[in-house]
Structures are given as C-alpha cells and as structure tokens.
Amino acid sequence: MGLAYFAPYGVGLGHASRLVMVADELRKNGSNAKFSSFGEAANYIVMRGYRCSMVAPVEFAWSMEGGFSVKDSLANIPLWFANFSRQVNQETRNIAACRPNVVVSDSRLSPVVAARLLKIPSIVILNQVKLLLSPRLRQLAVSRLFESMVGEFMGSMWALADRVLVPDLPPPYTIAAHNVWNIGSTSRKLEYVGFTTPRIQPSERRMEELAESLGIDRSSPLVFVHVSGPFQTRMALVKLALEAKRLLDPKIQFVISEGNAKGDPKPKKIAQSAWYYEWCPVRDEIFAMSDLLVLRGGHVTLSQAIQFGKPVVTVPIENHGEQLGNSTKMADLGLGIMLRHKGLGAGQLADGISHVLSRPEFKKKAEELQRIAEKMDGINNVLQIVRSYL
C-alpha cells in the first residue's frame, strides 16, 4: 500500500505530533510509515509505537533564564554545519535503504535535500520559512538586510520540495505571517492547508468528571498555563506563573503543565485553587474548560488555542523570532496580549491575566477565528496530499 518516510524537527513535540497523526491514519488503511528525528520528538515517536531512526541534532542554544542564547547559538554554527552534513548523509542512507514513495519533512531541511538527491518526491510542512532575528537586532538596517538575504536563500532550499504546506489559515488570518510572508523564492509554492492540530472536543460529561476529580469550580475562571518548548526555557515561566497565581484573586483557578513528556502524569494540588502537572494527560479537557490560556508562542499551541476559541496571554521565549512573530500576530488579531519575557515580573503577568479575563472582546474575537478555522481540516488535507503519492 506504499511507504511514507516522516522526518519531524526534534525540539518540542508539536512537529512530531502532527506527523504521528498523519501516520496513524495511513496505517489504518494499510500503508506503512518510517520516522527519523532527534531529541524529545524521537522519544515521543517511539512512545506512540513507531520505530524512529536517530539523526544528529541541529538546534539552537537556550539560556536557563528562559531565552534564546544568541552568543551560544553563534558559537554552535560550526557544529550546526557539521551535524547538518551528517543529517543529510544519514537521511540519504535511511531513505535509500527503504525507498519510500514520498518523504514528508516537518521543518527539517536535510530530508528534503536527501530526497532530492535520490529523486524521491518530497513534501515539507513548514510554518517558518525564514529565520527571524530578535527585535533588538532588527533595529539595524544591516541586520534586516541579512535577515532578508538569508530568508531568500532558505526559501530557495525549502522550495526543493515538491510541495510546501503551511499548517495555518490563509491570509489575512495567518498566525505565522511574520515567518512565511514576503519571501519571493517560496511565495508561489506555499499552500495553506489549515491547522494540523487534532480536532478534539471533549464531552461535557468527561469535563464534569475531571472537574469533580480535581475540585475545579466550573463557575469560576480557570487559567491553563501550558508550557512548551526547549526544556531549558520552561521552568522560568513555570516559576513566574506560580508567583502570579499568589497575587491574583483566589477565585481565579490555575492548572499549570510543565510539558515534560517523561514527567509524572498525576496532578499535584499546590494551592487552594491550583494544580500542577509535570505532564498533563488531560490537556485537551483542560484547554476546553479554561477561560484563558498562558502560552509561549509556539505555532501548534496557538493553533489549538484558536481551535478551542480561547483568548491568550503569550510570553514568547526571549529573542525567539518565530514565537515573537506568532505572538505579535495573535495580539494584532485581537486574540489576547503578548508580554515580553525579559524583565517580566509576576505582577505584570498577573495584571495581564486579569486584563484579558475582564474584557469579553478577546473571547469574542477568539470564537470568531475558531469558526473560520473549523472550515479547514489541516490534518485531512495533509493526509490526502501524502496519500496521492502512495
């Protein structure tokens, strides 16, 4: 029935989770799937029952304060090139050994290059065509020129794929607008397929059971602090959220998820109206029950916020261009507010949460975009495109 070779980016779980969903659907119809990745994504893929070939990591450096480390990332450039070359070699061997009908990359360039070398069709799923510099660096004209030049070069490399799929809404509602627009080398190849996050709507009975087991009062506001991204950046936001909770009205309830895929799935009650998960196995239920989401700014979690019709307070990783771009667009669309991590205090976070909770226009706008998103089934659109090659 055909074989698809899936190659998601290894940092965080968003890239891997959407390809696993596609692979699950293919497997139901008798098609086969193989994976390659690195880091947390590889562990997740194995946990979901698939074999995963490990490849050399190509990732940025992060500070323990929760930010993107420009200095350390620049120092890693020689290692990036070395590991990228290793990735291309590894992927070429892996793909040549199994001869798939199609290679499906999620935000990784090496599988696209390997597929091109082997003359095998390839699809790339991408919500960041170019690398955005931090706002501080972009104040310099030479930095903006550099960003544009690198963006066009990267665009030409991504365009080696037969199809370039953007898991987002079409303009003017594109969340990743800052990361994918205005790049001539890929502009004609971009296909907006809709969000590729699962369309799960927990039953009211299931949510009532969960609320009862945790002791959540459905008549009082519930804030879900869902932390994701590189491990080094998570705890800084978790600690900030814990401090902000103490400053807010006790009636405002909190659920905090550390986002550790290997963590304890059992909740810990940390205050009269606050619960803490190392890994939250009931994330969808908590999303649906919440009145407000506190998120980093990753594309997958923001997509889910829109699909559930929830307003947000985003705290993007400092100097993380993609998350800053996504968060800025969310704020521009009226879906919530963005707070910069650098210098952010618990009082400011508490004020931001109170601000969004007290203004119904944020909720109204989130529900408006939810209705638009419901018209596009991203996972099914990707699935049909992959199936066309099998």
Regions found by a protein language model. Give the residues of each.
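A short, glycine/small-residue-rich beta-strand->loop->alpha-helix junction that serves as a flexible
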Residues: P8-V20, Q232-M235
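Donor-nucleotide binding loops and adjacent catalytic segments primarily
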Residues: A23, T197-L292, L324
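Conserved nucleotide-sugar phosphate-binding/catalytic loop shared by glycosyltransferases and other
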Residues: K28-N29, K34-N83, H226
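Conserved nucleotide-sugar donor-binding subdomain of glycosyltransferases
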Residues: S69-V102, R108-S110
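A donor-sugar binding/catalytic signature common to diverse glycosyltransferases
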Residues: V102-D106, V282-N326
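A nucleotide-sugar donor-handling region in carbohydrate enzymes
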Residues: V142-Q232, G259-K262
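Conserved donor-nucleotide binding/catalytic region of nucleotide-linked donor-dependent transferases
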Residues: G336-I337, K342, G347-Q348, G352-L369, ...
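C-terminal alpha-helical cap of glycosyltransferases
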Residues: K375-L390
